[in-house]
Amino acid sequence: MTTGRMVELIDTNSSEIAAEFVRARTRAGSPAMGMVMTLVIVVPEDHAEAAMDAARQASHEHPARVLGVILGDGRGAAQVNAQVGTGHGWAGETALIRLKGEVVKHAESVVLPLLLPDSPVAIWWPADAPDDPAADPLGALAQRRITDAAATTRGKTKAMETQCASYAPGNTDLAWTRITLWRALLASALEQHRVKVIGASVAAERISPSADLLATWLGDRLRVDVERKNSSGPGITEVVLETKAGQISIERRDGKLATFSSPEAPDRPVALKRRDVPELLAEELRRLDEDEIYASTVRRLAARRPGNS
């Protein structure tokens, strides 16, 4: 059955999916799509539509072969179903692959033959991620492994701590990506005001993996204790740096516009909008090497967990 440019394959296999990619490119008149990577998305059925839409938007900056993988019930006979095609706003190729039965335990055997040759592989878990992404059979196929502790259906703080403890080069979390703009503003503030910071605080919703990472990053950079305060949100609402000359602060109450305050200078507005997942995903796909600052931050956060010295 064909819907637009998407072809549905029932009880199929990797070879048939790969052949359908070739046919889809031919129908589109684009034998070479100029794709730069493979993006694998491991997603539950109820998150699949939103995750694939986010990847579609990100594909305009990073043309890719996008493989959505839905791991279904692992009981019973193995079955692979897929929707394959191009177009529909995609800058590349896409397949949404549903696995059932025994093959769920060996999803990498379906995905591996579909990876673009001689190109990087990124994998994204939009909801619950494995405790150790680099050791996961699908995660082991990728150079970049993207999780999102804030989107987990389990405890968000625990999920972030678990990702910190199992960090491996190539891992990242969208909780970190969400604070890129905060970190840039704070770094700029410290450049403008070359004074010693003697204390700091980060205010955010009580459960906020991003705030925990930001507080840890600040403590690592400034070598001061950073107080983690609770607010009603949304997200991170304020960062304060204490200096002998006075406070340097960035306050954002509406999730869109912040106020930057510093000693002996008038307050000024700063754009600091909470970004959507497609923009966060696109940012992470720009770099496929190890993020050493993230690595240092998560190791420091992991070391602060109860039971660690």
Predicted feature descriptions by range:
Residues 57-68, 115-121, 140-146, 219-228:
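Structural alpha-beta junctions
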Residues 1-33, 173-190, 287-309:
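Short N-terminal or domain-adjacent regulatory/targeting segments
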Residues 65-74, 124-126, 148-152, 225-236:
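A generic structural motif
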Residues 157-247:
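A contiguous, surface-oriented mixed alpha/beta subdomain in the mid-to-C-terminal portion of proteins
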Residues 88, 168-177, 270-273, 293:
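Extended, compositionally simple fibrous regions characteristic of intermediate-filament-like scaffolds
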Residues 1-119:
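An N-terminal, globular interaction/scaffold subdomain
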Residues 93-187:
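Internal, hydrophobic cores of structured domains that mediate oligomerization or house catalytic pockets
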Residues 222-223, 235-237, 244-309:
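Long, compositionally biased intrinsically disordered terminal regions
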